Amino acid sequence: MENFDKTMKFSYEEIPKEDVKSVLQNVHRTLEERGYNAVNQIVGYLLSGDPAYIPRQNEARNQIRHIDRDVIMEELVSNYLKESKN
């Protein structure tokens, strides 16, 4: 039986931050061009893993699918916390 009282360490394959940033910028721009609420669509994708939240236009869907959702979330949280310090 596992002990759920211990904190597990999370690790993932390191992807350059600029790659994550450029993909998110392209996805955001594409969603806005299509008239969607970009933040809601990205959150929907991150929570569900369903690529249908992201359009195929500008290769946005293909690009975001090549980055693990965990990596995207780590980058978003990291940047949010950096910004909130200022």
Swiss-Prot record:
Q: Which Pfam families match?
A: IreB (PF06135)
| Cystine bridges | none
- InterPro entries recorded for this chain? IreB
Q: Which family does it belong to?
A: Belongs to the UPF0297 family.
Q: What is this protein called?
A: UPF0297 protein SERP1181
